[in-house]
Amino acid sequence: VTPTVPAKPVTPTVPAKPEKPAKPEKPAKPEKKTKQKKQTLPEKPAKPTKPVTPTVPAVPKAPSVPVVPVTPVVPHPTEPIPNVAPTPAPDRTSKVSFDFYGLEIKLPKVEIPVNKIGEMGNGNAIKALNSSTFEAKALPALKKQIDEMQLPDYFVAELVRDYAKALIGDASIVARTNLMHYILLLCGFDIRPAYEVTTGTPILLFPFDQMVFARTFLELNGQKFFIFTPDLEKLNVKEARFRTPQFSSPMKELRNVDLVIRKPLNIKGDVHNYTLTQGGITVKGSVNERLMKMVYKYPQMPVPCYAQSVLDANTHREVEEQIKAQIGTEVNLGNVNRLLHFVQSAFAYATDDEQFGFEKPYFFEELLYYPKCDCEDRSVFYATLLRNVMGVNNHLINFPGHECVSVSLPNENILGSFYEN
């Protein structure tokens, strides 16, 4: 065993001087006691108030900037949607059906007090019919039918005649005459009922705006009243008596019957084809046969009234456009004479008595329907074409037994008979 080396002796340390005791710190002043508040009891909780609806903040106004319109985009359906018209409410009014120049007309069927309208001239028929439902239930439909067909005055009278027959065809002719008179009054015509003294035959007295030939007439306060049977046939009588009831409004505003056909009729019918060729001019087309039947026995009026009338605007236009295309519209003596030659030579001649057995002036359209015509018919045709094709001012001139046309050509030096107007 290795002997251990004895450790060095430790030098004793001199004890340090004792430190002076620190002065004792002054004791801190005790803090003042804070007075404690008396303990209060908790307050009763307040009653809950109703919740307040929060107000929506106002949206600030946008600045006034012009808005560019946006074209809406229309969606295209993948399948076409049929355009189905709404179904009209069914008309439950009872109808009466009757024939009018081959057309089936249906108008309201109303009760007519037949037993109260069987006497003439005492006004009782008007009072009884005023108490019926005709004006309220039937008159609007009748006026609508008249407007749809664009019937001129005389054909309104014929439609009323046929309607009255359909309503009370089994009644006496006096009752039917009174019903016709009443309906024509409602249509605005100053037509009077009367009866022939010797036979008691009921008649209707028509006031016209024009003179009517080949008809007997009476005169009352300067107004001519022409005599017609209830069937609107001619009746030649030597003596007649009539009485006019006092009418209340609106029947005071009554008028005469105008025979000039101022508006084309809106009536369809079979067609009659024609072709006219003469002097290098050819005109072809068709006319409405039903209209020809309607005017066959039209009351005879002065010849210029036929030139003022238009039955079918399509027929007028058809002829006039073809004439314009072939001779032009320039107003000169050559064109006027060329048109005159066509009118004089394209038609065969016959008097009315030879062709019909009675005097029958033509409307413009009838010249294209019948195989023959006379001077007054050609004059109407020529005067109409002069006016509508070339705008030539002209007059229809009547000589005893003859009709012709005078023409105004101020830029032409023409020798012959003339007059100044």
What annotation goes with each model-predicted range?
Residues 175-326:
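Extended, non-transmembrane interaction/recognition domains
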Residues 3-75:
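Intrinsically disordered, low-complexity proline-rich tandem-repeat tracts
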Residues 169-180, 351-410:
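Active-site neighborhood of thiol-dependent amide/isopeptide-bond enzymes
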Residues 180, 184, 340-344, 383:
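Generic solvent-exposed, charged/amphipathic alpha-helical segments
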Residues 191-222, 319, 323, 327-330, ...:
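Hydrophobic/aromatic-rich core segments of domains that either
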Residues 120-161, 305-370:
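Secondary-structure boundary elements
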Residues 54-187:
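Long, contiguous, compositionally biased segments that the model treats as domain-scale units
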